[in-house]
Amino acid sequence: MNQIEIFFQFYAYFLLLISYFIGSIPFGLLFTRFAKLGDVRTIGSGNIGTTNVLRTGNKKIAALTLLCDTLKGTIVIWIAKFLIYPIDNNIISVLAGFFAFWGHLFPIWLKFKGGKGVATYLGVCLGLFWPAVIVFTIIWIISFLFKRLSSLSALVAVTAVPIFVYLFSPCFYTNCTIAIMSVLVIIKHHANIRRLLIGKERKVTIKKRNG
């Protein structure tokens, strides 16, 4: 291994650390506070993700949260793909996406109490195998139109996506990573699953804003 390869190897490790910190940024909490909507953790489900931000009644802030939480997973993958050279950037880009996803689930800034990871999951899928995002979106929309339950829609979609990726993605690392992330998303929805089983899961409602 020459000096250039050693340099890029250390650079790759540094990128993984940065990916985690980027993933840890709680955009939902930051945006709702900036918009003076209060602490999103005290609203609805108490989650910092898009669905709960939407419950504040501010659709623009919810959309911005969705965008930024998604891009967390995509940007780090793009950086790894185009800047990690000459070492194998395929495995590094996959790991960068996973570290960003892990950071969203367990953010250091919030004492490791983060979101459920759906938006960042989509961002990682976008960076690794973009057709998976289309499959997720179609399944989510169909499920939501029938039940109006965001959590159920997400659970159905993340269950189907790994199967699709396994069938059509040529990358072993991508297949494994998306499958692991799907399991983690399901685990993070454990409270939602319990409520779904007893018929007490909250449907998506938007808080009316005064004025």
From Swiss-Prot:
Its EC number(s): 2.3.1.275
Pathway the protein acts in: Lipid metabolism; phospholipid metabolism
Keyword Transmembrane among record annotations: yes
Membrane topology type: Multi-pass membrane protein
Record bears the keyword Cytoplasm: no
Alphabetized InterPro entries for the sequence: G3P_acylTferase_PlsY (IPR003811)
Molecular function terms from GO: acyl-phosphate glycerol-3-phosphate acyltransferase activity
Gene Ontology CC terms, in alphabetical order: plasma membrane
EC top class named in words: transferase
Location of the protein in the cell: Cell inner membrane
Catalytic activity: an acyl phosphate + sn-glycerol 3-phosphate = a 1-acyl-sn-glycero-3-phosphate + phosphate
UniProt cross-references to Pfam families, sorted A to Z: G3P_acyltransf (PF02660)
Domain of life: Bacteria
Entry keywords, A to Z: Cell inner membrane, Cell membrane, Lipid biosynthesis, Lipid metabolism, Membrane, Phospholipid biosynthesis, Phospholipid metabolism, Transferase, Transmembrane, Transmembrane helix
Spans through the membrane: 10-30, 64-84, 90-110, 126-146, 164-186
Signal sequence, renumbered to the chain: none
Gene Ontology process terms (BP): phospholipid biosynthetic process
Family note: Belongs to the PlsY family.
Subunit structure: Probably interacts with PlsX.
Function text: Catalyzes the transfer of an acyl group from acyl-phosphate (acyl-PO(4)) to glycerol-3-phosphate (G3P) to form lysophosphatidic acid (LPA). This enzyme utilizes acyl-phosphate as fatty acyl donor, but not acyl-CoA or acyl-ACP.
Protein name: Glycerol-3-phosphate acyltransferase
UniProt source species: Bartonella bacilliformis (strain ATCC 35685 / KC583 / Herrer 020/F12,63)
Gene behind this protein: plsY
